[in-house]
Amino acid sequence: MKRILLVNPNTNAATTASMLAIAREAAAGLLQIEAMTAPEGVPMITDPLALQQASQVLTGLIPELRAQNWDGVITAAYGDPALQALREGLDCPVTGIGEASMLEAAGYGAFAVVTTTPELAGSITAMAGWLGLGALFGGVYLTRGDAVAVTDDPALLVERLEEACLRAVHEAGGGLASLIIGGGPLAVAARVLVERVPVRLIEPVPASIRRIGLMVQRANG
């Protein structure tokens, strides 16, 4: 069985555990999924500086990851920190939850991202452009309130994300085929919202498992 490492670029071990459980469910026993929490950094990436710092931390882990001989690696924060560095430094396929979810969403048509971190909206928009998906990208919709405070309250997080999802659907006037819940710490809330949102909801962690599975399969010909 192929061994996949999901790396949480922030320092919150509870977030890592939640994402690992969701990833293993998505893998359905076809991949062996393990997880690692960043050894330093911030508990939640909320701005470009924290995203850059997370990239530096993950880049520093490349020698360790190379020695562990993973079959695939996932960078599991929505800004995909260190994605290119990991691809260049490792001898295995690498994806990120941002890239994987956007590419999956684009397969259905126009999409938007719903998230809690206003300071990362520019990075998310840039990612859509870098992936060549600008024509399908419907923008970033934000939850009300402080990102950390909202994320730390599971019930409030679901409520605010649902509100933002419904606002996105309304403002798009039926023009969106899907919405992405953008953020590793939002993974559990995304599971809840699948049944509540009137368009297809893309969960980044399961999307990354599907993508890395295909990448590993292709790499092994």
What is each PLM-predicted segment?
Residues 169, 212-220:
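Short, hydrophobic alpha-helical segments
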Residues 47-68, 156-165:
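Glycine-rich, highly charged phosphate/nucleotide-binding loops
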